[in-house]
C-alpha cells in the first residue's frame, strides 16, 4: 500500500552505539560552529577585512541576520523607517529566543551567535535520535555528517533561524514517531512560529497518523491533536501581523512590494534562474553567476535528483514532506538562497 511503503521499520534499529552519543554530538557541533566562525574570520582576514574583534562580530549582521537581530532588540514597528517596517515578514520565533538570551548577554550579535550555536548542537542530537529510528548507528552518523557539512552549513552558525528551525522540526517528528504527538505538535507549532515553511510539517505528521490508523485500525486522538497544533504557530504570527499592521496577512503585501516575492512553480524558478545565470555570464557578472545563480540551480536540481533516487528507500511520510516543502520553497518567484532553504529539509541528507 502506498501509505505504508518504507514505513515498516522497527521503532528503533538495534545496533551497537557508543556511550554518551548525545554529549559527543553536542560537543562536536559546538566545535564545528566555532570552526565555521573562525574560518569566516580567516577568509575575511585574507581579503584584508579582518579589523577588530568587534568588527569581526558585526560582519554577522549581514544579509537577513540584521533583520532578526533588529526584531530581537526592538520588536516590530508599524511606522517609520521603511526597511524596519517590512521586517514584519520575518517570523518572531527566533528573535524571541535571542531576546531571552539577551537577558544574560546584552549584546544582540553575541546572543544571536550563542543561540544559533546551542540550537545547532541540540539539533544534531535530536536529528541523530530521529535517524536512529530507521538506521543503524553508522548510517545515522553518516546522514548527520551530510547534513551538518553540506554546502551552506555556515547558515547554522549565523544569527538566523536555520538552527532553531532544524531543532524544532526534528523534535516534532521524533516526538510524533515515539508516541508523544502532543509534544511533537507543540514543537511543530513553534517551528511554524519560526518559519512559515514549518506549516508543511503537517504533511508528515498527517501521513504518520494515517499510517498508524491503518496499522492499528483506529485513530489515536492524541495524534490528531498533535497535527492540528502545528498551524497554531502560524496563526499566532498572523495575529501579530494584525496587531502591528491591522492586517493578518500584511507580510504577504510586504513580500510582494519589497521583494517581489510570490508563490510560483518550480519550472518557472528553474527557467528564470537559468536565464539570470546566462545573462550574468554574457555581461561579465561572474560574481552573481557563480556566487548566486549557479549555487541555486545546483541545490535545486541536486536535491530533486537525490530524492528521486532514494524515494523507494525512504519513509513515505518523508517523501511526501520533501515534495510539499520543495514545491513551496523552490517555487518562490524571487529565490535568492535555495541552499539555505533546502539545508534544513531532513529527507535530503537521508537520501
Regions found by a protein language model. Give the residues of each.
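Transmembrane-helix signature of polytopic, membrane-embedded enzymes
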Residues: 107-111, 127-149, 167, 183, ...
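Loop-to-helix entry region of an early transmembrane alpha helix in multi-pass inner-membrane enzymes
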Residues: 85-88, 92, 96, 104-125, ...
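Membrane-interface transmembrane helices that cradle and orient dolichyl/undecaprenyl
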Residues: 135-137, 172-183, 210-215
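Short hydrophobic/aromatic helix or loop-helix immediately within or flanking a transmembrane segment
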Residues: 59-77, 83-106, 272-277, 329
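Membrane-lumen/periplasm interface segments of specific transmembrane helices
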Residues: 32-51, 60, 190-191, 202-306, ...
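Multi-pass, polyprenyl lipid-linked donor-dependent membrane glycosyltransferases
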Residues: 115-119, 134-138, 142-176, 190-201, ...
Amino acid at each position: 500500500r502506498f501509505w505504508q511503503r518504507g514505513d515498516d521499520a522497527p521503532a528503533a534499529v538495534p545496533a551497537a552505539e557508543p556511550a554518551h552519543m548525545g554529549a559527543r554530538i553536542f560537543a562536536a557541533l559546538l566545535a564545528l560552529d566555532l570552526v565555521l566562525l573562525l574560518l569566516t574570520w580567516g577568509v575575511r582576514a585574507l581579503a584584508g577585512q579582518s579589523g577588530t574583534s568587534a568588527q569581526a562580530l558585526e560582519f554577522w549582521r549581514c544579509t537577513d541576520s540584521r533583520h532578526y537581530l533588529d526584531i530581537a532588540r526592538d520588536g516590530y514597528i508599524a511606522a517609520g523607517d521603511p526597511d524596519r517596517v517590512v521586517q514584519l515578514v520575518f517570523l518572531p520565533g527566533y528573535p524571541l529566543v535571542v531576546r531571552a538570551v539577551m537577558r544574560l548577554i546584552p549584546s544582540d550579535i553575541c546572543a544571536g551567535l550563542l543561540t544559533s550555536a546551542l540550537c545547532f548542537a541540540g539539533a544534531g542530537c535530536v536529528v541523530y535520535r530521529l535517524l536512529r529510528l530507521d538506521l543503524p548507528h553508522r548510517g545515522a552518523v553518516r546522514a548527520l555528517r551530510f547534513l551538518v557539512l553540506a554546502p551552506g552549513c555556515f547558515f547554522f552558525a549565523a544569527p538566523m533561524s536555520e538552527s532553531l528551525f532544524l531543532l524544532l522540526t526534528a523534535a516534532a517528528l521524533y516526538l510524533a514517531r515515539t508516541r508523544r504527538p502532543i509534544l511533537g505538535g507543540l514543537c511543530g507549532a513553534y517551528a511554524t512560529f519560526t518559519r512559515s515553511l514549518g506549516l508543511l510539517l503537517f504533511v508528515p505528521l498527517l501521513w504518520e497518523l494515517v499510517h498508524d490508523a491503518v496499522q492499528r485500525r483506529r485513530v489515536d486522538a492524541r495524534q490528531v491533536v498533535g497535527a492540528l497544533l502545528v498551524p497554531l504557530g502560524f496563526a499566532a504570527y498572523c495575529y501579530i501581523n494584525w496587531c502591528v499592521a491591522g492586517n493578518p496577512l500584511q507580510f504577504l503585501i510586504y513580500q510582494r512590494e519589497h521583494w517581489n516575492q510570490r508563490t510560483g512553480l518550480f519550472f518557472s524558478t528553474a527557467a528564470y534562474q537559468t536565464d539570470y545565470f546566462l545573462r550574468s555570464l554574457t555581461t561579465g557578472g561572474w560574481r552573481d553567476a557563480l556566487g548566486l545563480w549557479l549555487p541555486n540551480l545546483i541545490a535545486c536540481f541536486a536535491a530533486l535528483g537525490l530524492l528521486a533516487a532514494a524515494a523507494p528507500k525512504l519513509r513515505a511520510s518523508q517523501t511526501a514532506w520533501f515534495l510539499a516543502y520543495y514545491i513551496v520553497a523552490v517555487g518562490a518567484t524571487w529565490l535568492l538562497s535555495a541552499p539555505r532553504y533546502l539545508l534544513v529539509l531532513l529527507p535530503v541528507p537521508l537520501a
